[in-house]
Amino acid sequence: MWTYKKTLQYPVNIKCTNPKLAKVIISQYGGPDGELAASLRYLSQRFAMPDQKSKAILNDIGTEELAHLEMVGSIVHQLTKNASIEEIEKAGLGAYYTDHGVDVYPQSAAGVPFTAAYLACKGDIIANLQEDLAAEQKARATYEKLIDLCRDEPDVVDPLRYLRQREIVHFQRFGEALRGVQDKLAEKKFYMNCDNMQTSDCGCNNNDN
């Protein structure tokens, strides 16, 4: 169960209208490395985590990604809400406007609609966590590219920098989860080997005479 607060995790106060920037930023809403894919991936993977700590980490990060989704949606909305038809057409958003107006629709910067194929739930704990580490690095790299593209709009860059920093924190927390799971698996394997050991293997019945 979640408790919703009617405030963004970090303020988004954009004064300019720039649908051209919205066209690329929307990739972090519904693109392959975006916040929607991340939130669904982590919240789905959490069920199979082997202990409460790793489940809590995925639950926490998946929940925060929903907050980031809201932030990205707010950025896109504020960049387009007052755009004229001419500005929309000039930004190359004529097809988008035809289907969605200025609603925030989950798609990539290239216009590819969101798909569940972006999720990674492999049925292998280590593989899932390795995927999560890679996902955070890809998201960080995407935010860095967006910051470069938005360099002349400080109101846009500010929340993007915040989101980039959170991806770094998430990467560190997934590393913590992976180390914990690997330690538990190694410990389990050690005890299984001990349980399967024959008495003669430990030398307990050896006769010194």
What are these model-derived regions, one by one?
Residues 1-209:
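Non-heme di-metal
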